[in-house]
């Protein structure tokens, strides 16, 4: 009886260790390349879908080292400042491409603003804001407002983001400690 209980405890511990390693490896994911718009690509949104890029940005989490790939035909993409984004003004772009396949490296935390080089395309919704997270930052957005259209004020308490950040970064550690605790507890149980 004791041997059977020991074997089942060891199997459970092994399974929990494997699960913890999978979770930890997912948390340590490296830089990613995001194709803007996924299968939709970089093009003028359909008339009733002008928020397609806002939805796309809100469904992804961007980090320093990631990159954005814009794939398009007979168009262009420009990185602009905040004013250029909201006014669809590409007269003074930070960077501009029209080669049909453009990649932008996300090399700093903060907001990146992208528009089509065509004013008409931009005003029809072909524009994108991407928020790049600080290292270990966990940022919860209002569910009704995607990150690409969230308010730009910094009025939130720095303590709130610091505590959220530390909670998010301690998750992999907690996942690794659970199997260790269970192993120790199971050996104590078996020894009695």
Curated annotation (Swiss-Prot):
GO molecular function: electron transfer activity
Keywords, alphabetical: Cell membrane, Disulfide bond, Glycoprotein, GPI-anchor, Lipoprotein, Membrane, Signal
Tissue: Mostly expressed in flowers, and, to a lower extent, in seeds, but barely in seedlings, stems, leaves and roots.
Topology of this chain in the membrane: Lipid-anchor; GPI-anchor
First and last residue of the signal peptide: 1-27
Main location as per UniProt: membrane
Cellular compartments per GO CC: plasma membrane; side of membrane
Protein's cellular compartments: Cell membrane
Disulphide bond pairs: 88-122
Lipid-anchored residues (GPI-anchor amidated serine): 166
InterPro entries referenced in this protein's UniProt entry, alphabetically: Cupredoxin, ENL_dom, Phytocyanin-like, Phytocyanin_dom
Residues making up the propeptide: 167-192
Ranges for domain Phytocyanin: 32-134
Glycosylation sites: 48, 89, 101
Keyword Transport: no
Superkingdom of this protein's organism: Eukaryota
Biological role stated in the UniProt entry: May act as a carbohydrate transporter.
Protein name: Early nodulin-like protein 7
Organism listed in the record: Arabidopsis thaliana
Organism ancestry: Eukaryota, Viridiplantae, Streptophyta, Embryophyta, Tracheophyta
